[in-house]
Amino acid sequence: MVSSSSDIELIEAQGRIWGYAYTYIINKCLKCAIQLGIPDVIHRHSPGPTSLPALLAALQLHPSKHDAVRRLLRLLVHAGFFKLEQEEKECNYSLTPASELLLLFPDKLDSGDDAFGVWSSLSTWFRRSDGAAAAEAILGMSFWDAMARERWAMPQFYDAMTGDSKLVARVMVSDYCRDVFRGVGSLVDVGGGTGIMSAAIAGAYPNISCTVFDLPEVVADSREARAIGLPNLEFVGGTMFEKIPHGDAILLKWVLHNWDDENCVKILKNCREAVSSSDKNNRGKVILIDMVVEINQIVANDKDFSQVQLCSDLLMMCLVNGKERTEAEFNNLFITAGFSGYKIVRALGPRSIIEVYP
């Protein structure tokens, strides 16, 4: 093949390819830093930064590894997980919002590594002619069945979802999102898991009756939320593909991206029926927390989440035949399910709050 690009352009392209190919190294190095306890040591030295000698003394590593720690931190500083303050020849480190988050929720980093070997067999899946998700085709069972078979996997998944719900709930019940719940008297959290999100909403809004709706075996394991003892919080077992309890607002946090368009329309139709049955004046709404993929971003910046959205889209495609959707794709779902309008509030990093109206 004769290239139309100059040698300089090809060299630059090579570097760009390397940059994407090596991103897994950041994940592995960050996990290593957490396992060594580096964020904990720096946190204990706060509010001031931690010098490299003080960090090394606390880690109690063999002297042969001291320069390796410096080089590990150099990469993680560049990736934005630590901040470097250099005074003459001494390196001093402090936490950034990203590492503070990992200190609070260390499972944020854990994405299941290669998800049962799915990624390494992806090209094999592309060559198949059936419609099974990559995970199902490669594992011989659904991703969820594979998770249930491995004793460590499902608890790890629910721990990650619980940590995420705690973080998202803090934003949802803040003044920043107060308008979302204005005029809502009852709320049904569909696929609400063990009730962490609903418990936060019920605690912040005593006037809202909150119902956690999920599979019976899921809501049965809701000790943490039940222990709070909120009188306006209840748990109901069932399936969103049959009938959803009535409510002024129906909440689906990170649910639709697990499903293809056909199943999403079924879920949304049941949500519309539940809202319409509750509010005869059609003031009700469905509240979605999901990614809205933006593919028009040209210049990357700290608030550009295009890469994580696109990676998440492929993750859902491979694991469960789901997808992350653009605004146009969401609009098509809403129209097909019989809704009249929607509003998007980009308030949760790579995710958005979408209010959908009957």
Give residue spans per PLM region:
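Conserved adenosyl
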Residues: 2, 107-305, 341, 347, ...
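Conserved Class I S-adenosyl-L-methionine-dependent methyltransferase catalytic core
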Residues: 2-186
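Eukaryote-biased feature marking scaffold/signaling PDZ-domain proteins and nuclear chromatin regulators
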Residues: 33, 50, 64, 214, ...
